[in-house]
């Protein structure tokens, strides 16, 4: 990622990571409203989705099946939960708050067949990050389901999203506001933005806008953000003992 970013900048080329989470109308709404909740003290995001391939993977490991390991769990393809879905919890965090001071990961992994012999591949992880004056934590899994909401907590209130990878609903609670607070009967404010029927259009729209305006970097999906996220993912993999053939 670092080499690609350097090459793109030196040659004046447009390069943008196709990260939908940080280009969606609801993420933009979050950025617009985040000052309303005061100084942020914690960020939490979860993306847990039981993979349709994990049952097949278990049969391959046990010898019941002899087919190739699915790409999403294949070390030869640099697969695993962190690379596949964990990034959707981490990229928005970096876009909002920058690179953390520290990363502490608890990684669950299994051994799967690979070209150069069995290798560990991560199926889920929980990660804690430290920032000046705040903390962040993420949870992601391809081996379990969860309906946990994403929440950004501040001194004056909080903002929650139904899901972090493609946000379709967002709400805000500001302490003392007429529509919110902790009093009986108070309701959070719905801050959901109008979205396209096809959520992925926001990625194409951002890229086209960059081309038409002559810019070579997205603000939210900047090269600095992409490099920072790649470095965080490397730290998580290192702490979990996840090594790919492509790392050589």
Tell me what each language-model feature is.
Residues 1-22:
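Beta-strand-loop-alpha-helix segment that lines the small-molecule cofactor/substrate pocket
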Residues 10, 206-248:
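C-terminal helix-rich "cap/oligomerization" subdomain common to oxidoreductases
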Residues 21-106, 115:
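Predominantly a Rossmann-like dinucleotide-binding segment in NAD(P)-dependent oxidoreductases
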Residues 150, 167-184:
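Short polybasic amphipathic segments
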């Amino acid at each position: 990622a670092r080499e690609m970013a350097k090459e793109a900048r030196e040659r004046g080329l447009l390069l943008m990571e196709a990260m939908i989470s940080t280009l969606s109308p609801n993420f933009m709404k979050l950025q617009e409203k985040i000052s309303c909740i005061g100084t942020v003290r914690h960020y939490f995001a979860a993306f847990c989705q039981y993979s349709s391939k994990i049952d097949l993977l278990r049969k391959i490991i046990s010898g019941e099946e002899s087919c190739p390991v699915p790409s999403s769990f294949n070390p030869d393809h640099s697969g695993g939960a962190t690379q596949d879905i964990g990034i959707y919890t981490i990229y928005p965090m970096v876009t909002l708050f920058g690179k953390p001071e520290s990363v502490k990961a608890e990684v669950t992994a299994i051994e799967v067949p690979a070209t150069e012999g069995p290798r560990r591949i991560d199926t889920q992880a929980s990660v804690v990050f430290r920032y000046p004056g705040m903390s962040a934590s993420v949870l992601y899994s391809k081996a379990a389901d969860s309906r946990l909401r994403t929440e950004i907590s501040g001194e004056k209130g909080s903002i929650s999203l139904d899901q972090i990878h493609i946000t379709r609903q967002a709400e805000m609670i500001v302490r003392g506001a007429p529509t919110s607070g902790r009093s009986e009967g108070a309701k959070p404010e719905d801050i959901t933005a109008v979205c396209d029927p096809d959520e992925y259009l926001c990625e194409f729209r951002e890229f086209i806008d960059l081309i038409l305006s002559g810019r070579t970097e997205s603000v939210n999906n900047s090269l600095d953000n992409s490099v920072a996220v790649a470095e965080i993912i490397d730290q998580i993999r290192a702490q979990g003992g996840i090594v790919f053939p492509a790392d050589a």
